[in-house]
Curated annotation (Swiss-Prot):
The keyword Transport applies. It comes from Clostridioides difficile (strain 630) (Peptoclostridium difficile). Its EC number is 7.-.-.-. The keyword Cell membrane applies. One of its GO terms (molecular function) is ATP hydrolysis activity. Its main location: membrane. Disulfide bonds: none annotated. This is Energy-coupling factor transporter ATP-binding protein EcfA1. Belongs to the ABC transporter superfamily. Energy-coupling factor EcfA family. The lineage of its organism: Bacteria, Bacillati, Bacillota, Clostridia, Peptostreptococcales. It is a peripheral membrane protein. Gene3D superfamilies: P-loop containing nucleotide triphosphate hydrolases (3.40.50.300).
Length: 277
């Protein structure tokens, strides 16, 4: 399977009058087409800085990033790169630009010079894909947080990306809104084969990924399947990260002498395990 993202030994420094802060330190990462990768790490680990480098908002100080074989340092490819790898930010209000939902989703295709008839078809498809078509005439400020974020996702989908980067896109949402957005993310990945890079601090969201990457002090310190990564409970806690609730619970039950698996990730898995006792 081909890689859509290749991060080659990148470093990134924030430079101020007082000092240089290395936010990413010699990091490499490949993401395959159609893969769902979650990137986790506590505040200051470099994960959001990485996401902005992937979308060419920031440029690596060292190394390079290829998005579908396009180098993010090539200014003339910037528009193509951002169309290929769209980005959804933490606050949907910062990404919504129009006063009507369908007009907001149409904004990107209009700037591509697409014919109006084709734009209408794209907008309809994009809104239906995130379950927001029935609210196409609504004003965005009247929507819930989860609905706004789905409109922002529809706006990215309308650009026909091969990859979407979610930079803590659920962080400002309540549990219901997070559930809405995660359902949308999973459907886009599994049904439309859109590559997903999901930066998050919610471990239950990372469980949904094909692969989890753990960052600490700008470095990639661990990666693997969710089951492999979250089995390292002690290591994760030492760097200030939690593990999924059911993984934590299974660890506590094992300490109490209950004979269950140590790599449980979800409620359903816990129920099945306990029913076998």
């Amino acid at each position: 399977m081909d890689n859509i993202v290749k991060v080659n030994n990148i470093s990134f420094e924030y430079i101020t009058d007082e000092a240089k802060l290395k936010a990413i330190d010699n990091l490499s990462l490949d993401v395959k087409k159609g893969e769902f990768v979650a990137i986790i790490g506590h505040n200051g680990s470099g994960k959001s800085t990485l996401s902005k480098n992937l979308n060419a908002i920031l440029m690596p100080t060292e190394g390079n990033i290829l998005i579908d074989d396009m180098d993010t340092k090539e200014e003339e490819r910037l528009w193509d790169i951002r169309q290929t790898a769209g980005m959804v930010f933490q606050n949907p209000d910062n990404q919504i630009v129009a006063t009507i939902v369908e007009e907001d989703v149409a904004f990107g295709p209009e700037n591509l010079g697409i014919e109006p008839k084709e734009i209408r078809r794209i907008v309809e498809e994009s809104l239906k894909s995130v379950g927001m078509y029935d609210l196409r005439d609504r004003q965005p400020h009247l929507l819930s947080g989860g609905q706004k974020q789905r409109v922002a996702i529809a706006g990215i989908i309308a650009m026909r990306p091969k990859c979407i980067i979610f930079d803590e896109a659920t962080a400002m949402l309540d549990p219901s809104g997070r559930k809405e957005v995660m359902k949308t993310i999973k459907r886009l990945n599994k049904e439309e084969n859109i590559t997903v890079i999901h930066i998050t601090h919610f471990m239950e969201e990372a469980v949904e990924a094909d692969r989890v990457v753990v960052m600490e002090k700008g470095k990639k310190i661990l990666e693997g399947t969710p089951r492999e990564v979250f089995s390292k409970i002690k290591m994760l806690k030492e760097i200030g990260l939690d593990v999924p609730c059911m993984t934590e619970l299974s660890s506590l039950l094992i300490e109490e002498g209950i004979n269950i698996s140590s790599d449980i990730l979800t409620v359903d898995e816990m129920v099945m395990e306990l029913c076998q006792l």
